[in-house]
């Protein structure tokens, strides 16, 4: 995988550098409640600022549908960016036109300016050539540090790279290098853990993974659908019975590709979906008709951890059970801790991503121990599905 990075950027003092960042952070009562995404892009902004560039930040926030919406203004985010960077961040009330141009013209070398929400213009999501040209007029160089938006062919993620010299920021670079280790050119054996509630949201993912990994562990509500497809009565467990044929096709594809499928052999069942509910461990073939499986059981955990022990590379998307409710977090926590320990010892490359996955690893207090944890959501999932990422592909073409 070849693309230009900040290492290739020299002599940029005084240059206007347009940096696409991900500032789509949660806000409550006007306050940013989670600054993770801002922290991720801070190193790129600081590096460009220290090199004397005029740093101009481009980002979207929410879904304003091509029109200005007051509570989706990036002005709300500017103070949080300032706090993390520990330097003044100026704000312009538009991302194109005179307001943007004048604010950029007023910048001194090394200063940072945040432009207004790119999605306040319909041309952003349409990747409209006229809008791209208007954005490009504000910069000499383009840096994309928003992998999380790389699956969208929008003006600020893909269009700009066709108009200006384009580079990957440090977060984009780290993400792409980690993903290359995960599935692009991994050390084998490769084990994938895929969990979560529904097979229907991850059909493309499963079909792609069985061709690329040595073993696929299926957990969460998804496992019930696969068990039911094999004739197992899963009681009142979450199950997509209408996807039985899809599940069978995925199992057949795995068999043909030589990919081992690891399904639960036992489970933790309960009759109520609440914290501290009465529960018991049963064989998956003995799930009571009035109960639901909410986590995989101890024998299944042992089997999963055995696969993690054999793996050189682990790719993880989705929890193994209803981890947000005690005691149905045991399997997810046990597998996460085992993977983290092997990663710390240098025996495993572990790459994880997806909102629930990040929350689960944080719950297990091991997120920092994984080789890489992606906060990219949709882009991470589409990468795992083997789909093209326009924002990445255009950077490779620039090389």
From Swiss-Prot:
Pathway of this protein? Carbohydrate degradation; glycolysis; pyruvate from D-glyceraldehyde 3-phosphate: step 2/5
Q: Name one Pfam family in it.
A: PGK
Tell me which EC number(s) this protein carries.
2.7.2.3
| Gene Ontology process terms (BP) | gluconeogenesis; glycolytic process
Molecular function terms in GO for this entry?
ADP binding; ATP binding; phosphoglycerate kinase activity
Q: Where does ATP bind?
A: 202, 324, 354-357
Which InterPro entries does its entry note?
Phosphoglycerate_kinase (IPR001576), Phosphoglycerate_kinase_CS (IPR015911), Phosphoglycerate_kinase_N (IPR015824), Phosphoglycerate_kinase_sf (IPR036043)
Broad enzyme group: transferase
Could you give one GO CC term from the UniProt record? cytosol
Q: Which PROSITE patterns match?
A: PGLYCERATE_KINASE
Binding residues annotated for substrate, in chain numbering: 22-24, 37, 60-63, 119, 152
Catalytic activity reads: (2R)-3-phosphoglycerate + ATP = (2R)-3-phospho-glyceroyl phosphate + ADP
Does the entry feature the keyword Chloroplast, yes or no? Answer: no
What subcellular locations does the record give?
A: Cytoplasm
Keyword entries, A-Z: ATP-binding, Cytoplasm, Glycolysis, Kinase, Nucleotide-binding, Transferase
SUPFAM superfamilies per the UniProt record, alphabetical: Phosphoglycerate kinase
**Which PANTHER family does the record associate with it?**
PHOSPHOGLYCERATE KINASE, PHOSPHOGLYCERATE KINASE 1, CHLOROPLASTIC-RELATED
Quaternary structure annotation from Swiss-Prot or TrEMBL: Monomer.
What family does the entry list?
Belongs to the phosphoglycerate kinase family.
Concerning HAMAP family, the annotation shows:
Phosphoglyc_kinase
Output this protein's name: Phosphoglycerate kinase
- Source organism of this protein record: Sinorhizobium medicae (strain WSM419)
Primary gene name: pgk
């Amino acid at each position: 995988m070849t693309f230009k990075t900040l290492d290739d950027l020299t002599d940029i003092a005084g240059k206007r550098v347009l940096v696409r960042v991900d500032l789509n952070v949660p806000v409550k009562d006007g306050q940013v409640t989670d600054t993770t995404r801002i922290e991720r892009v801070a190193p790129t902004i600081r590096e460009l600022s220290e090199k004397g560039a005029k740093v101009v930040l481009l980002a979207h926030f929410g879904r304003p549908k091509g029109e200005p919406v007051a509570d989706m203004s990036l002005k709300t985010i500017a103070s949080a960016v300032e706090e993390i960077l520990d330097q003044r961040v100026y704000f312009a009330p538009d991302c194109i036109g005179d307001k943007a141009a004048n604010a950029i013209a007023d910048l001194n070398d090394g200063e940072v300016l945040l432009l207004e929400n790119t999605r306040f213009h319909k041309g952003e999501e349409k990747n409209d050539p006229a809008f791209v040209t208007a954005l490009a007029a504000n910069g000499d160089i383009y840096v994309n540090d928003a992998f999380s938006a790389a699956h969208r062919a929008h003006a600020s993620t893909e269009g700009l790279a066709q108009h200006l010299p384009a580079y990957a920021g440090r977060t984009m670079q780290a993400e792409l290098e980690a993903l290359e280790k995960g599935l692009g050119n991994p050390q084998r054996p490769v084990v994938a853990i895929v969990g979560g509630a529904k097979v229907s949201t991850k059909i493309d993912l499963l079909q792609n993974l069985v061709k690329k990994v040595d073993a696929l562990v299926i957990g969460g509500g998804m496992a019930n659908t696969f068990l039911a497809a094999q004739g197992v009565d899963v009681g009142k467990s979450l199950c997509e019975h209408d996807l039985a044929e899809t599940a069978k096709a995925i199992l057949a594809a795995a068999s043909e590709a030589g990919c081992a499928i690891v399904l639960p052999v036992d489970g933790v069942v309960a009759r109520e979906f609440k914290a501290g509910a009465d529960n018991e461990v049963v064989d998956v073939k003995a799930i009571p008709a009035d109960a639901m499986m909410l986590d995989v059981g101890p024998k299944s955990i042992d089997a999963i951890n055995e696969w993690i022990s054999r793996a050189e590379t682990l790719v993880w998307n989705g929890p193994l059970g209803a981890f947000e409710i005690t005691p149905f977090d045991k399997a997810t926590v046990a597998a996460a801790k085992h993977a983290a320990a092997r990663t710390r010892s240098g025996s495993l490359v572990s790459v994880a991503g997806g909102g629930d996955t990040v929350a689960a690893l944080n719950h297990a207090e091991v997120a920092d121990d994984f080789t890489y944890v992606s906060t990219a959501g949709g882009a991470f999932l589409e990468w795992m599905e083997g789909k093209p990422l326009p924002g990445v592909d255009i950077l490779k073409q620039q090389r």
